């Protein structure tokens, strides 16, 4: 008799995705981040669901409802901080996952890559709207500043901003709709993840060498299931260290002050995972130019596959590209630091240099390095 997992219509899908899936024998720990992102999404949906049971999306009660969750709900503080720091873990895994894709040339799977970019935008939108919900000072002013960027769009800008706000400023209507979108988006993300995996399983996984591995496959279970579980344990350990020892390490103290439209905080800044993009936005003196640079800082990922000039897929055997890649990583860390600094000398100049370097590496230097490496191969 054939095993039920191979015949049952539903179990068959699970079997082909998680059990009998042929996987390359040499994929490293950098391939763990996909499953870690799945774990993060599940943690966020579960903790978010329990938070939504106690949260009220009204300007008069939003802040106090979050306080109530932390003080009066059984383990409410734990759920709240798991959700807040879970978002940070989510973005750490996201950036590692994207970095892995760039380093090992995984972007040549165009459909998977493009769905991934849409996923990145969706997660960023969800995180932004979630940050507004506690209705602290940084929530309110962050929402005001970021939504206001849309007013830079010619002709329809102002109308568009007021349409999103549901009024003439960030108020009740804005908070209610942000809560609605923040609730629905993770489920849309989960659906997109399924499409992401569908396209991935059309081609199979890439591997560190970038060379087709059809001749050397191993079953996903038990080899990579056990490897993923190790990753899960490490992620949960790191998350628990954050939540139980310093839950506010990555947050902003200003958000413990209730939102006040009459009092602007001295430094308005987003959560740490948006700081690199915020630094790029601020480094351009023109409003529309800044907004375009902000969008392009993420959308540039869609151009990367078309700038792939190398005869090799992976960077494993491409030393010049490797150096450029790690300079890019250092540059992103620099931008993250600058995004959190006040707008004054020397931070303005450092931010502008780092922004130019970011676009130069991706658009000019990496393709050039690939062409040089192709030449070296011929010698």
Curated annotation (Swiss-Prot):
Subcellular location: Mitochondrion inner membrane
Cofactor: heme b
GO cellular component, one term: mitochondrial inner membrane
Residues that coordinate or bind heme b b566: 97, 196
Keywords: Electron transport, Heme, Iron, Membrane, Metal-binding, Mitochondrion, Mitochondrion inner membrane, Respiratory chain, Transmembrane, Transmembrane helix, Transport, Ubiquinone
Similarity comment: Belongs to the cytochrome b family.
Protein's UniProt name: Cytochrome b
Protein's organism: Lepus californicus
Gene: MT-CYB
